[in-house]
Amino acid sequence: MLFFKKKTNKGQSEPSTNKIRLNTEVTDEVFGKLVYTCVGLWKGFIETELFGIKSTVRVLIYTEEDDGEYVEPEQQQAVREYLSRKNEIDPLIESELRRGYGLDDCFVLSDRFIFDSIHIHSGGDFGFSFIDNTAPEGRSDRNMVVTVIPEVSFFGDEDDYV
């Protein structure tokens, strides 16, 4: 992580917490190692648990600018909020998947859905994408629960996502 010194009004220098891309990589306190992959997109991995299964999933962080900087406190705060409320939010995610697909409480979600990735957007909105093992031929197998933060809401498959 690089730290730059910024000038104060009195000409004194103080450390800046701005992080900047270095060889397309940055270390973030929440996400760990992130790699700048293309215009406005950083990619990393995070270890988490959903449906009672621990896994390492992709984190896709979308930023608005292509200037190489990664300074996204809203996104970091959204993940901190999710992690602090995980026990409250995860059942809502499961409930929304059940509702969206018409599945009863006895259905084991991990039999059908594979937790694929977390998508985090500027401003802190983020959602999870899943791979649906039973997707009909010709349809996308990726399904999303979009906007985990600020609220949990089912959005359907990516063919409907615009």
Predicted regions and their residues:
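Acidic, proline/glycine-rich low-complexity IDRs
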Residues: M1-V35, S117-V162
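N-terminal "domain-start" segment
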Residues: L2-E94
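General structural signal for secondary-structure boundaries
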Residues: G68-E72, D105-F107, F126, T147
